[in-house]
From Swiss-Prot:
Site residues, Interaction with sigma-70: E241, D250
Protein name per UniProt: HTH-type transcriptional activator RhaS
Matches recorded under SMART domains: HTH_ARAC
Organism this protein belongs to: Salmonella heidelberg (strain SL476)
InterPro entries: AraC-bd, AraC_XylS_family_regulators, Homeodomain-like_sf, HTH-like, HTH_AraC, HTH_AraC-typ_CS, RhaR_RhaS-like_N, RmlC-like_jellyroll
Highest taxon listed in the record's lineage: Bacteria
Cellular location(s): Cytoplasm
Complex formation: Binds DNA as a dimer.
Role noted for this protein: Activates expression of the rhaBAD and rhaT operons.
Example GO biological process: positive regulation of DNA-templated transcription
Residues annotated as domain HTH araC/xylS-type: 174-272
Keywords: Activator, Cytoplasm, DNA-binding, Repeat, Rhamnose metabolism, Transcription, Transcription regulation
Cellular component, GO, one term: cytoplasm
Length: 278
């Protein structure tokens, strides 16, 4: 597995924060690093496989990667990221208590992926721009200024994330997308889902298409197929059982959609043929 080292990304041996844009981010194999990372998705879509679990990401997704997490990107479509790298909590001279603003693992669950709306994303861009323009000076005022901006970024993300529960249409869509991540295998009635999240059906269709480039049903199908591919690789369930577990009522229809999406059959994935080619 590829290991990325801080010496290759940080401007100096003491700098606690670095900005690394990926415009766009191509598919990238599984890796980990000796630093922490906040991944901010500007726009586009892709699959983020985080510690073996696949997540669909799009504009407004924010992912918190720790120094022991492993992840990769695949199935990317104009995926543009800004990565805010930071060494460790004890690398800061003026900041303490950062863990109170970061997602925390509880009972084995780590809420690594948050979502923010487009207006917050614009504020994030402005803060990151300020961080890039502060320069590499290591005198106390310059270091303090960079650390203050990093703290402001964490506060903005914390306040604006799904966890804080906003009420505008962007936030409602974020909540809906998070709900689909957990309920993808259920029969979904879009009229009922729209009502559940206080959105009109027309707004749901328009906003999901703007965020992901996909209609609601195509987005749901892709989500199901991604989950199915994960089970094909990491479980012993039969193809038919996996199809049903992931919300498909017909295994033949599942196989047709799967091949159309990934250019491999479910059996190919089960036998690891895609990995052999790569």
């Amino acid at each position: 597995m590829t290991v990325l080292h801080s010496v290759d990304f940080f401007p100096s041996g003491k700098a606690p924060v670095a900005i690394e844009p990926r415009l766009p981010q191509a598919a990238f194999p599984e890796h980990h690093h000796d630093f922490h990372e906040i991944v901010i998705v500007e726009h586009g879509t892709g699959i983020h496989v985080f510690n073996g679990q696949p997540y669909t990401i799009s504009g407004g997704t924010v992912c918190f990667v720790r120094d022991h997490d492993r992840h990769l990107y695949e199935h990317t479509d104009n995926l543009c990221l800004t990565n805010v790298l930071w060494r460790s909590p004890d690398a800061f001279q003026f900041l303490a208590g950062l863990d109170q603003l970061l997602p925390q693992e509880q009972d084995g669950y780590y809420p690594s992926h948050w979502r923010v709306n487009q207006s917050v994303l614009q504020q994030v861009r402005q803060l990151v721009g300020l961080m890039e323009r502060t320069g590499d000076g290591m005198d106390a005022p310059a270091v303090a200024n960079r650390e203050i901006l990093f703290m402001q970024l964490l506060v903005l993300l914390r306040r604006s994330s799904l966890m804080e529960g906003a009420t505008n249409n962007d936030a409602k869509l974020n909540q809906l997308m998070a709900w689909l991540e957990d309920h993808f295998a259920e029969e979904v009635c879009w009229e009922a889902v729209a009502e559940q999240f206080s959105l009109s059906l027309r707004t749901l269709h328009r906003q999901l298409k703007q965020h992901t480039g996909l209609t609601p049903q195509r987005y749901l199908n892709r989500l199901r197929l991604i989950k199915a591919r994960h089970l094909l690789r990491h479980s012993d369930h039969s193809v038919t059982e996996i199809a049903y577990r992931c919300g498909f009522g017909d295994s033949n229809h599942f196989s047709t959609l799967f091949r159309r999406e990934f250019n491999w059959s479910p059996r190919d994935i089960r036998q690891g043929r895609d990995a052999i080619i790569q």
